[in-house]
Amino acid sequence: MYLGRVHCSFEVPGLLSGRVGHMSMAVRSVRLACGPRGALLLLLLVLLGVLVVLHKVTQSPLLNQNKILQDHLRGQHERYIQSTRTILLWTEFFGDSRWKLSWDTLGPQELRDELHCPVYQCEISNQNAFLPAVELYDAIVFHAAEMFPLLRPVPSQRSPHQVYVFALMEPPGETKHRLDDEQGFYNLTMTYRIDSDVFWPYGQLLDITADAVVAPSVKPPWRKPPVAFNDSLVWDLWSGKTKTAAWFVSHCETLSKREVLANRLQEFFEVDIYGNCGTLSCTRGDPHCAEMLDTDYFFYLAFENSLCDDYVTEKLFDALERTVIPVVFGGADYSRILPPHSYVDANRFMSVEGLAQYMKLVVADPDLYVSYFWWRSHYRLTYSSPFCDLCARLHDPSFGHKTQFYHDIQSWWFNSCRLQSRIRL
């Protein structure tokens, strides 16, 4: 049936007038001759046009700057996390080319399963040829207690993105480099100092309840010692102990003068000295030596060879594994390392006599002696590889945008030590 010509018109709203994208909307009214299907088609086209315009507006950089930035940073972060970082061990670690690691080259699986690194997408190798060129490594680690290798003192090429790491677990007196010749050479430090870029302690304390490592750190959230504490095992061991103090030592003349302190203590009670500096011997690694501390001795002398910030050695942490109170002597602030009332700090006393008298007091008072072991109910000793920290650092997106340099590594390292102890020797 013929319906005749049907006129239809579409009024374009005035608010769309002007230019949106590349489309001119200046025409306010369009009158077309069309049939019913044409009218429907026209309506669909108009709706499609509106959707296109709205899409262009909502995706405009003028309105979506934050989203564009967020997408970019998120993608960059994912790339940093997923990609593998490579670490080259340039020098040996006291003659050990593997740095006490299990293989010449460790991959992500070993970092995850053996070192238990939370961030493990790294490869560590002592083989220069692991990558085609030395400048391709993300980080190169130099042990400052070793001389540079004679045939290859330093890498011949260095890329801008590459990180050179100053690594040392010993105090500054053990440095075998002329650091005044290495200004601006290192980007990161990996040492026992808490303010190092990569922390390398001899041991750590984990809060059992929080399941988190709390020390060493600048201000550990230590729990308060209880007013009263009882441990039947410690009581039983206390009753069988007969000797005041033991000391295992191999270096007899030191910068800290610890040997003087030990000799002065012998004016007040007997100190059994094992090793090169005494008359007694006990083979390193012999379990009897450790058990002897539990059964025979009230104290163990954890005296350091240098008075340097944060410097404490494995002998302190070894003593914490035994039922013996460590008497500490060093340059560290021990409140940043050990729980309160878990040790006796020689530098808290003005004189050797004052220290000796307090040690005698503790020996004679079983309640006081047992109270020094309260921390075992709340903390346990643990250890993590510094390579876990280094791997995480190399994966940090913020670190990828900047490369710092130590322009005076010598002052940073050497100024952390002193020659004079607080206790008068």
From Swiss-Prot:
Lumenal topology ranges: 59-425
Residues bearing carbohydrate: N187, N230
Its EC number(s): 2.4.1.-
GO CC term (a single one): Golgi cisterna membrane
GO biological process terms on file: fucosylation; protein glycosylation
UniProt GO molecular function: fucosyltransferase activity
Annotated protein name in UniProt: Alpha-(1,3)-fucosyltransferase C
UniProt source species: Drosophila melanogaster
